[in-house]
């Protein structure tokens, strides 16, 4: 299973924010610079993450973006569920004539749920805490 770039960069943005020292704000420009992503694409991602409560945006001179809740409360599985369309196959009879008798859709749905359940075992804090190699790569030491 491959995540969409939207989900991939959403997770990366959250990882970056979770890696920052407590209380430090960042900007969309800073995140796009770190990952080399289009600013327009990242704006859409951050807006979606903000609507979902994962990111808080503060306007004004000293504004920026930061995690909307503690990193230890943000499960990776929840983020993927919220950002990723998880229909693995297009099972409409319009596209596939075996749809009425096919059991593949159910098997794939169960596999996707197992995947998400495993991701639920990890929070952003698990991914970033005491991860010096990550801090060095993100230049947040």
Curated annotation (Swiss-Prot):
InterPro entries membership: TR_Rrf2-type_CS (IPR030489), Tscrpt_reg_Rrf2 (IPR000944), Tscrpt_rep_HTH_NsrR (IPR023761), WH-like_DNA-bd_sf (IPR036388), WH_DNA-bd_sf (IPR036390)
Keyword Iron-sulfur appears in the UniProt entry: yes
Entries under SUPFAM superfamilies matching the protein: Winged helix' DNA-binding domain
Single Gene Ontology MF annotation: double-stranded DNA binding
Superkingdom field: Bacteria
Gene Ontology annotations of biological process type: negative regulation of DNA-templated transcription
Cofactor names: [2Fe-2S] cluster
Pfam families: Rrf2
List of residues binding [2Fe-2S] cluster: 91, 96, 102
Cofactor remark: Binds 1 [2Fe-2S] cluster per subunit.
DNA-binding region (UniProt annotation): 28-51
Domain HTH rrf2-type, first and last residues per copy: 2-129
GO cellular component, one term: cytosol
Keywords, ordered alphabetically: 2Fe-2S, DNA-binding, Iron, Iron-sulfur, Metal-binding, Repressor, Transcription, Transcription regulation
Described function: Nitric oxide-sensitive repressor of genes involved in protecting the cell against nitrosative stress. May require iron for activity.
Protein name per the record: HTH-type transcriptional repressor NsrR
Organism this protein belongs to: Klebsiella pneumoniae subsp. pneumoniae (strain ATCC 700721 / MGH 78578)
């Amino acid at each position: 299973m491959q995540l969409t770039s939207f989900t991939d960069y959403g997770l990366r943005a959250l990882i970056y924010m979770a890696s920052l020292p407590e209380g430090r704000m960042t900007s969309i420009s800073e995140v796009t610079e770190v990952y080399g992503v289009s600013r327009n694409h990242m704006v859409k991602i951050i807006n979606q993450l903000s609507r979902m409560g994962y990111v808080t945006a503060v306007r004004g001179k000293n504004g920026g973006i930061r995690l909307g809740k503690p990193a230890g409360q943000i499960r990776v599985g929840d983020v993927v569920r919220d950002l990723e369309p998880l229909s693995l196959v297009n099972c409409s009879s319009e596209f596939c004539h075996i749809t009425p008798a096919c059991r593949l859709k159910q098997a794939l749905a169960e596999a996707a749920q197992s995947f998400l359940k495993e991701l639920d075992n990890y929070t952003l804090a698990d991914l970033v805490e005491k991860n010096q190699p990550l801090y060095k790569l993100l230049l947040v030491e």
